[in-house]
From Swiss-Prot:
The lineage of its organism: Bacteria, Bacillati, Bacillota, Bacilli, Bacillales. Belongs to the radical SAM superfamily. Biotin synthase family. [4Fe-4S] cluster binds at residues 63, 67, 70. The gene is bioB. Binds 1 [4Fe-4S] cluster. The cluster is coordinated with 3 cysteines and an exchangeable S-adenosyl-L-methionine. Binds 1 [2Fe-2S] cluster. The cluster is coordinated with 3 cysteines and 1 arginine. Gene3D superfamilies: Aldolase class I. This is Biotin synthase. Residues 45-271 form the Radical SAM core domain.
Length: 321
């Protein structure tokens, strides 16, 4: 079957939502053929470069939200809890990031949103990091923020703000009830209004439909997220979705390919759950994605850095530093 999707996309002819759902669900369209189309687009915009990102879990487990995927949810009785870490620990993480060719360092806090004191703590730390590592991009992920807090983060040197949509608007209330889909969209838009690069992505494998998956990709196109992390559910015992099966590696590849075709110019990152869902097919994901998280995630482990570097080298790709 001749797809010709890449040429259409490169000619600025966007796929429609109905087309995308049909392509995604069509069993006659081979996953590797679809991936090759995505690779043509990825190569056009990013060549063989791979961006590296690293996470610091700066505050853990102190959260009143009931997100069904999260081991830090209010529903979880047993979880790792600690308040916002000292500035020196955050700075040490920045040093580690620089030493490991990481381009973006992500400072993440649990909870609905930060207090003004916590924002000041982060801002002071970021200002110090930028003096020593001016080339290191700083991404903050602090939850739902206020306008004045966003202005402070921008002034301190925060380059990017992550706030994932996580799922489709239709499926949102199955995932969390303590905040709305609109809350998430508004947070992303507020960061854009304050000239902070928006990072927003998804978690696939929470029981959503194929239509939901495609809706997510189009929603992210609509809000114009610069960076799109694609997480695959890593089920955690005790959470609402803890008993769900992992996605198949081939479905994961199909998802990543569709996100690339729908958001051709964006940084697309394979993120949490990639190791357990993609398994031995992880390297193939970089035919569509151009970015990965290196090291551990918030409360689940990643594979050793050396394996990620080897994967990139074996593909004939190179780190985008």
């Amino acid at each position: 079957m001749t797809l010709n999707l890449a040429q259409r996309v490169l000619n600025q002819e966007s796929l429609t939502k109905d087309e995308a759902i049909s392509i995604f669900e069509n069993a006659e369209i081979d996953t590797f053929d679809l991936l090759n189309e995505a690779y043509t687009v990825r190569k056009h915009y990013y060549g063989k470069k791979v961006k590296l990102n690293m996470i610091l879990n700066a505050k853990s487990g102190i959260c009143a939200e009931d997100c069904g995927y999260c081991g830090q949810s209010v529903k979880m009785k047993e979880k790792q809890r600690y308040a916002l870490v000292e500035q020196d620990q955050i700075k040490e993480g920045a040093q580690v990031a620089t030493e490991n060719q990481i381009g973006t360092y992500c400072i993440v806090m649990s909870g609905r949103g930060p207090s003004n004191r916590e924002v000041d703590h982060i801002c002071e730390t970021v200002e110090d990091i930028k003096k020593i590592h001016p080339q290191l991009k700083i991404c903050a992920c602090l939850g739902l923020t206020k306008e004045e807090q966003a202005k402070k983060l921008k002034a301190a040197g925060v380059d990017r703000y992550n706030h994932n949509l996580n799922t489709s608007e239709r499926y949102h209330d199955e995932v969390v009830t303590t905040h709305t889909y609109e809350d998430r969209v508004n947070t992303v838009e507020m960061m854009k209004d304050n000239n902070i690069s928006p990072c927003s992505g998804v978690i696939c494998g929470m029981g959503e439909s194929n239509e939901d998956i495609i809706d997510m990709a189009f929603a992210l196109r609509a809000i114009d997220a610069d960076s799109i992390p694609i997480n695959f559910l890593h089920p955690i015992k005790g959470t609402k979705f803890g008993g769900l099966d992992l996605l198949s590696p081939m479905k994961c590849l199909r998802i990543i390919a569709m996100f690339r075709l729908i958001n051709p110019t964006k940084e697309i990152r394979i993120a949490g759950g990639r190791e357990v869902n993609l398994r031995s097919l992880q390297p193939l994901a970089l035919k569509a994605a151009n970015s990965i998280f290196v090291g551990d995630y918030l409360i689940t482990g990643g594979q050793p850095n050396e394996e990620d570097y080897r994967m990139i080298e074996d593909l004939g790709f190179e780190i985008d530093s």
